[in-house]
From Swiss-Prot:
The gene is rpl32. The keyword Isomerase does not apply. The lineage of its organism: Eukaryota, Viridiplantae, Chlorophyta, core chlorophytes, Trebouxiophyceae. GO terms for molecular function: structural constituent of ribosome. SUPFAM superfamilies: Zn-binding ribosomal proteins. This is Large ribosomal subunit protein bL32c.
Length: 58
């Protein structure tokens, strides 16, 4: 005869969900920080190239 599964408590479910969300939030913050670093380095390299090109043309 089929027996229903034992239910997990809401507290355990909420704790697991909160843990997952906090880890995801940390990873998202890391990814954003890395993206900002890459963009800053690209902008710095681009501005350096523009300055050297303007000096060479003068």
């Amino acid at each position: 005869m089929a027996v229903p599964k034992k239910r997990k408590s809401k507290m355990k479910t909420r704790l697991r969900k909160a843990q997952w969300k906090s880890e995801a939030s940390r990873e998202a913050a890391k990814a954003l920080s890395k993206a900002k670093t890459v963009i800053k380095s690209l902008l710095a390299a681009n501005s350096a190239n523009l300055e050297s090109n303007s000096e060479n043309s003068n």
